[in-house]
Amino acid sequence: APVQRFLRTALKDGQPVVAGVRVRHSGTFNMGEDVENWKPFSSNQRVITRRAGFDWDARVSMLPGLNVRVHDAYLAGEGILHAALLGLITLVDMRGTGEVARGELMRFFAEAAWYPTALLPSQGVRWEALDERSAQGTLTDGAVTLSLIFTFGEDGLIETVCARSRGRTVGGGIVPTPWCGRFWNYQ
């Protein structure tokens, strides 16, 4: 029931399936591992939905004139995270089909709130209602299968998307960590 209510609210009758999206972001990004350390950023992102994928290019301002360029992507089943000071000095370079791919596919799946036709069962998402306001969505892309918990507001729209465990980079390694995205101010 909550997913049907969401789809009826978010989509129009006869709406075509979204195949691709371009998004510009600006805001602040928490760079802290143990304490909050919010830094301004701007980015451009391209998303494809026919086979889950995205390519996010960002600049995070660490200090005036000192930017970190971040490339975060999920392409053809591979996760990519590369960050470089001034775009020249590599700080992080992770790629592959294991936990990196899993984390990046989670990001794609959670952000599908912005292109909701990607959440239709016809697009490969399996849904299981948990209660009147939440459901578990499961997505498979190639060898990666994952599930996220979606909660919906009184208006029927997505409020949160959470994973019990998503890899987080700490000291050069990946640490499983609970992870949530929050959505509000739909326009």
Where are these regions (language model features)?
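N-terminal mature ectodomain segment of secretory-pathway/periplasmic proteins
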Residues: 4-89
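A structural detector for beta-sheet-dominated domains
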Residues: 24-26, 32, 84, 128, ...
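Short, solvent-exposed secondary-structure boundary motifs
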Residues: 29-41, 56-65, 110-122, 137-143, ...
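Buried hydrophobic residues that stabilize the cores of well-folded domains
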Residues: 40-46, 73-77, 81-83, 102, ...
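A short, polar/proline- and glycine-enriched secondary-structure boundary/capping micro-motif
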Residues: 65-71, 90-95, 147-149, 170-174
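Flexible, processing/modification-adjacent segments and terminal tails
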Residues: 82-141, 171
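Gly/Pro-enriched, hydrophobic low-complexity segments
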Residues: 136-186
